[in-house]
């Protein structure tokens, strides 16, 4: 926050060292890795599966906790200013493979920062019914797909009775 408020410029990237690194995922670990490597002179490309950069910073943390345009977008811009390239809608394993990145696109190393893991299910009747969401799915629908709005493609229906299993941050 201090750096943003005082327009402190990031460290400039060193002269390129001629080595290419692929970073899979544009969440906190991917952005950190990409920025640090770029500062050391590596040519870095970040591959993001979703259409928007930021990973859990964008889809998993509500706007009131982490302002997307004030903080996240500015941080991504700072990483871009270091020379990092970004490609969205690239699902590693489907769109391309790690082998292809290394053999056909000449990346010498790959960092996998593919994000939050899959949810744990309880194995109880009804957990796969329509309207039942894991924490990650709920956050993604709300933050990225704007499902809280009725005029969007994937609205979350609002009923009078809701059951929340768990007591973590998402539940609150």
Question: Where do the protein language model's features map onto the residues?
Answer:
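Ferredoxin-type iron-sulfur electron-transfer modules in oxidoreductases and energy-metabolism complexes
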Residues: 1-13, 142-143, 149
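Rossmann-like dinucleotide/flavin-binding elements
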Residues: 20-47, 87-102, 114, 118-120, ...
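Short amphipathic alpha-helical segments
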Residues: 35-36, 58-59, 122-126
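Glycine-rich FAD pyrophosphate-binding loop
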Residues: 42-58
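N-terminal glycine-rich dinucleotide-binding loop that anchors FAD/FMN and/or NAD(P) in oxidoreductases
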Residues: 60-88, 127-142
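Local beta-strand N-terminus motif with an aromatic residue
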Residues: 107-108
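N-terminal Rossmann-like NAD(P) cofactor-binding module of classical short-chain dehydrogenase/reductase
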Residues: 111
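Flavin (primarily FAD) binding-site architecture
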Residues: 114-128, 132-133
